[in-house]
Amino acid sequence: LTRRKIKNLPNNINELIIDFNSSLKEVSFPECDHLCVCMGTTIKNAGSREGFKKVDLDYCIDIAQRAQKIGVSQISIISSIGADDQSRNFYLRIKGMLIKKILTMGFDTVNIYLPGLLIGKRNEKRFLENIGQKIAPIIDRLLVGKMKKYRSIKADSIAAHMIRSKTKGVNYFYYEDIMNEK
């Protein structure tokens, strides 16, 4: 399920473009066994904290519940390093709330991706992220040892890992896990 067309998808991936502002109840979910949830926004683009929560938490949970009803057994979600449902930071708290809810839903396999700054093209301008993407290669070199998990990572690298992952159970993936996969 996507909000917009994704270029160069493998032939075994079915893409369903939907308007998340309309009712998801009207969407006919295709049969599948693995749901990848990569949806997210910013408070600025959502217009408010409530709008952000709607996209980053409510829509994601609704999609997961609908997918589970049609037999999906594996879910992969992109969250954020530092996600914690008790965080004082609103963004990290919402990300943590999503993880907590997904873990209670009973999927056979749950893959949780916890990246630092996501690198990639955006349809909209994000001033601070643009600056971050420019300085990330310099800062990344300073992040060694236990700090490596905070390195920036290309969104494409996470997507490729999601599609190839053969793990079972509950799994947490950080920068090194994704980049060192053979």
Indicate residue ranges for each PLM-predicted region:
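SDR active-site strand-loop-helix element
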Residues: 1, 38-39, 75-81, 113-115
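Active-site donor-binding loop signature of nucleotide-sugar glycosyltransferases
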Residues: 3, 18-20, 115
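Conserved Rossmann-fold NAD(P)-dependent oxidoreductase catalytic core, especially the SDR/UDP-sugar
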Residues: 49, 54-97, 104, 108-111
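NAD(P)H-binding glycine-rich loop region in Rossmannoid oxidoreductase-like domains
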Residues: 13-62, 66-69, 84, 166
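Structured catalytic cores of enzymes that bind and process phosphorylated ligands/cofactors
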Residues: 8, 16, 32, 62-65, ...
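Oxidoreductase cofactor-interface core, primarily capturing Rossmann-like NAD(P)-dependent enzymes
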Residues: 85-174, 179-182
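Short aromatic-enriched loop/helix-cap "lid" or pocket-rim segments at secondary-structure transitions
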Residues: 10-13, 27, 123-127
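Short, polar loop motifs at secondary-structure junctions
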Residues: 1-8
